[in-house]
Amino acid sequence: MSRIGKLPIKLPTTVEISHQSDATVQVINVKGKFGSLQRTLPEELKIEQIHNDNGSSLIVSFENQTRTNKSLQGLYRTLINNMVIGVTEQFVIILTLQGVGYRASVQGKSLVLNLGYSHPVEIDIPEGITVEVTQNTTLNIKACDKEQLGLFAAKVRAWRPPEPYKGKGILYKNEQILRKAGKSGKK
């Protein structure tokens, strides 16, 4: 049995969980104060909700303990746990823009970045993601869905990944860039 997969998921009182199952798949819905998330799970996955004095918790297990099911048990437990954390607290990724003239702003439903190109870069902000710009160079990106948040942050960062010679680019908070020395001239 997976070490992570056998741990129970603690449910806060503000979270509502419901799941329906068909012949081939089951769907779990998680609702909280920041929104609701939905995910399809395989039919052989068992989800038990246990109520006790400390509150309620979920236990994720497979009926048939094959090698692949043991590894997938930890995966699905973590995915459901991320859904619970997302609807109660939200996930945050902070990006910083480093470079002369690099600026960001939010205009309506799009993020506008000035990254040294001849034109500003406009990126549409997906549904469920909020972007706040502080000091024109720091982006606070928040979302309930951790997967969607990571994909959007990677999409923004892909426009100007950090380069090792001058250290310019879009960086995650606390990211260290390995700096390289430039060419040394003939002596």
From Swiss-Prot:
Any single GO BP term: translation
Compartments in which it is found: Plastid, Chloroplast
Keywords for this protein: Chloroplast, Plastid, Ribonucleoprotein, Ribosomal protein, RNA-binding, rRNA-binding
InterPro entries: Ribosomal_uL6-like, Ribosomal_uL6-like_a/b-dom_sf, Ribosomal_uL6_a/b-dom, Ribosomal_uL6_bac-type, Ribosomal_uL6_CS
rRNA-binding recorded as keyword: yes
Main location per the UniProt record: plastid
Molecular function terms, GO-annotated: rRNA binding; structural constituent of ribosome
GO cellular component: chloroplast; ribonucleoprotein complex; ribosome
Protein's UniProt keywords contain DNA repair: no
Sequence similarity: Belongs to the universal ribosomal protein uL6 family.
HAMAP family: Ribosomal_uL6_B
Stated role: Binds 23S rRNA.
Record text on subunit structure and interactions: Part of the 50S ribosomal subunit.
The protein's name: Large ribosomal subunit protein uL6c
Organism encoding this protein: Thalassiosira pseudonana
